[in-house]
Curated annotation (Swiss-Prot):
The gene is HA. Belongs to the influenza viruses hemagglutinin family. This is Hemagglutinin. The record marks 329-330 as: Cleavage. InterPro entries: Capsid_hemagglutn, Hemagglutn_HA1_a/b_dom_sf, Hemagglutn_influenz_A, Hemagglutn_influenz_A/B. It comes from Influenza A virus (strain A/Memphis/6/1986 H3N2). Gene3D superfamilies: 3.90.20.10, 3.90.209.20. The chain crosses the membrane at residues 515-535. Glycans are attached at residues 8, 22, 38, 63, 126, 165, 483. Its main location: virion. GO terms for biological process: clathrin-dependent endocytosis of virus by host cell; fusion of virus membrane with host endosome membrane; fusion of virus membrane with host plasma membrane; viral budding from plasma membrane; virion attachment to host cell. Residues 536-550 are cytoplasmic. Residues 1-514 are extracellular. GO terms for molecular function: host cell surface receptor binding.
Length: 550
């Protein structure tokens, strides 16, 4: 099928843009759904199912919690002096030593996790007059009664327990973490058998802080054959400060200190297996790629991760508005140009020319306008990732039961943050999509205006994205229009001559219209004459009377 108005002395170039049979729906500011030729998914909704061991240093806790590894539970001896970027705690982890509690468990866990090391230095505390290294059948090391390897259980010696007063200065250039405890016997008899006195007292001080604990004697639920307990406490000694320990009984003494480091190490609860792979972002579900700006796999993350949002999908337009080609129009689709619809099968570019002249038909992409649009779109995804990817870890929030209101408040704050980010993400993507569509439409209009200014009066805008050229324009001529080297003056005289000839033909072929207009006028005149004659006849017969008043 020929392009409109074509003969051997004219040519018809059309401008159009790429189209696909089935586009992708995206959201913009002005439209909930608009079809584009191509779009990229922005939400990562699945994990690999395993935690990658690179580039982060992963330490698998296996059967041990971090605190058990810190204290030196016998079945966690393999973790002594270990280091990590991320410590993985498993749901199967259990304690297998003397039953204990940590009043500020979450803070201690977080402090040690962020330090990223269990490096321990023994120190020579002088515990005179008491027996050291007490053990229990509830804490076996092999077949021998034992205790936490990082703690020293002190009890009576020859039925004596003198008051203890020990100091340990920090002459280093780093913070020291001391772990100590207080033993709570289940009965008064157990208290006196171990510590002689009916009630002991433990006070641990530095220049900045002081903690005093009085044992709480009484039976508790049985755990591993014991109804007594140990409470674990911790003290940080700054460089130049001094650790002072006073006790009259019930002291579980430190054997040394842990080095505290500042860093971005963390801890995560997960049962995902650890695999040999590489991923910057880790969630409890497993590692996820970070090549998208958003994810809805898990709120808890570690590493450089996409921002968590509620949406399952957000699509970023990376192509132009899609107007599928009308199949009823033959090989040239819309015979017209971009104003009516797009062109399918244009694989070399987003914008281009189709033409028909005396040499036949052809098609070519306009690479300059295509590249201009692509350059502006290509950076969008990277900019979104830079704006949204978290370069820090979002750790779990833990609170004790007495801090339930704080936990509720924390949950509310986190949920509000997620709601805000989910809304911001949707708005941000809609804005970017609107800009992309406006941008690609603008490039099409620029190309059309550039062509129109080249042709000037040598061609006529057909109103559908095509031009009717009033001079013979071979393929070389069409090529000059495409590449911007068309010389209007060369073809001006021929174009004007052909334009007048074609208009003359159109004028002659318009005689039928004149005849129709004349016939219509005569018919109206005859109708008026008949109507006037009827009125005069009726007046003569007296059927109609006319009164003229002046």
């Amino acid at each position: 099928q020929k392009l409109p108005g074509n003969d051997n002395s004219t040519a018809t170039p059309c401008l159009g843009h790429h189209a696909v049979p089935n586009g992708t729906l995206v959201e913009t500011i002005t439209n909930d759904q608009i079809e584009v030729t191509n779009a990229t998914e922005l939400v990562q909704s699945s994990s690999t199912g395993r935690i990658c061991d690179s580039p982060h240093r992963i330490l698998d806790g296996k059967n041990c919690t971090l605190i058990d590894a810190l204290l030196g539970d016998p079945h966690c001896d393999g973790f002594q002096n270990e280091k990590w970027d991320l410590f993985i705690e498993r749901s199967k982890a259990f304690s297998n030593c003397y039953p204990y509690d940590v009043p500020d468990y979450a803070s201690l866990r977080s402090l040690v996790a962020s330090s990223g090391t269990l490096e321990f230095i023994n120190e020579g505390f002088n515990w005179t007059g008491v027996t050291q290294s007490g053990g229990s059948y509830a804490c076996k090391r092999g077949s021998v009664n034992s205790f936490f390897s990082r703690l020293n259980w002190l009890y009576e010696s020859e039925y004596k327990y003198p008051a203890l007063n020990v100091t340990m200065p920090n002459n280093g250039k780093f913070d020291k973490l001391y772990i100590w405890g207080v033993h709570h016997p289940s009965t008064e008899k157990e208290q006196t058998n171990l510590y002689v006195r009916a009630s002991g007292r433990v006070t641990v001080s530095t220049k900045r802080s002081q903690q005093t604990v009085i044992p709480n004697i009484g039976s508790r639920p049985w755990v591993r054959g014991l109804s007594s307990r140990i409470s674990i406490y911790w003290t940080i000694v700054k460089p130049g400060d001094i650790l002072l320990i006073n006790s009259t009984g019930n002291l579980i003494a430190p054997r040394g200190y842990f080095k505290i480091r500042t860093g971005k190490s963390s801890i995560m609860r997960s049962d995902a297996p650890i695999g040999t792979c590489s991923s910057e972002c880790i969630t409890p579900n497993g590692s996820i790629p970070n090549d998208k700006p958003f994810q809805n796999v898990n709120k808890i993350t570690y590493g450089a991760c996409p921002r968590y949002v509620k949406q399952n999908t957000l699509k970023l337009a990376t192509g132009m508005r899609n107007v599928p080609e009308k199949q009823t129009r033959g090989i040239f689709g819309a015979i017209a140009g971009f104003i009516e619809n797009g062109w399918e099968g244009m694989v070399d570019g987003w914008y281009g020319f189709r033409h028909q002249n005396s040499e036949g038909t052809g098609q070519a992409a306009d690479l300059k306008s295509t590249q201009a649009a692509i350059d502006q779109i290509n950076g969008k995804l990277n900019r979104l990732i830079e704006k949204t990817n978290e370069k820090f870890h979002q750790i779990e929030k833990e609170f004790s039961e007495v801090e339930g209101r704080i936990q509720d408040l924390e949950k509310y704050v986190e949920d509000t943050k997620i709601d805000l980010w989910s809304y911001n993400a949707e708005l941000l993507v809609a804005l970017e999509n609107q800009h992309t569509i406006d941008l690609t439409d603008s490039e099409m209009n620029k190309l059309f205006e550039k062509t129109r200014k080249q042709l000037r009066e040598n061609a006529e805008d057909m109103g559908n994205g095509c031009f009717k050229i009033y001079h013979k324009c071979d393929n070389a001529c069409i090529g000059s229009i495409r590449n911007g080297t068309y010389d209007h003056d060369v073809y001006r005289d021929e174009a004007l001559n052909n334009r007048f000839q074609i208009k003359g033909v159109e004028l002659k072929s318009g005689y039928k219209d004149w005849i129709l207009w004349i016939s219509f006028a005569i018919s109206c005149f005859l109708l008026c004459v008949v109507l006037l004659g009827f009125i005069m006849w009726a007046c003569q017969k007296g059927n109609i009377r006319c009164n003229i008043c002046i």
